[in-house]
A protein has these predicted regions:
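A glycine-anchored, Pro-Gly-centered beta-turn/N-cap motif
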Residues: 11, 63-66, 72
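Extracytoplasmic/periplasmic copper-protein system
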Residues: 4, 9, 78-93
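Short, surface-exposed alpha-helix to beta-strand junction/turn motifs within ectodomains of secreted
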Residues: 15-17, 21-43
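Aromatic sugar-binding surface patches on proteins
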Residues: 50-56
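Transition segment at domain starts
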Residues: 1-6, 38-39
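Short, flexible loop/turn segments at beta-strand junctions in immunoglobulin-like
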Residues: 59-61
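Contiguous beta-strand segments within globular domains
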Residues: 7-17
Length: 93
């Protein structure tokens, strides 16, 4: 959440990603960037309590605009996944 290429009327409070395997928290991260290339998340990526397959990061109130989620994770089976995807906020903070 949000979904890839989602258009949201309200900004999300956080980004939460779900993977098929358990993640190694020390080697897994997610961040959110604005159109100017500035990191906008609260720099607190962490596994979701009780679910080692979910990674989340908290967001401040975001103004309308296009954002990019970037992540790099290491699963316990040794696979590294690195990717990014955009989402757009159209509504108020």
């Amino acid at each position: 959440m949000p979904a890839r290429r989602a258009t949201l009327a309200q900004p999300p409070a956080r980004v939460e990603l779900t993977f098929t395997e358990r993640l190694e928290p020390a080697y897994s991260t997610v961040s959110v960037w604005n159109e100017a290339g500035t990191r906008v998340d609260l720099r607190d990526p962490a596994l979701v309590a009780g679910n080692p397959r979910r990674l989340a990061v908290t967001l401040p109130p975001l103004p309308p605009g296009r954002y990019t989620v970037r992540f790099r994770v290491l699963s316990v089976d040794g696979h590294v996944v690195e990717a990014d995807f955009p989402f757009t906020v159209t509504g108020p903070r």
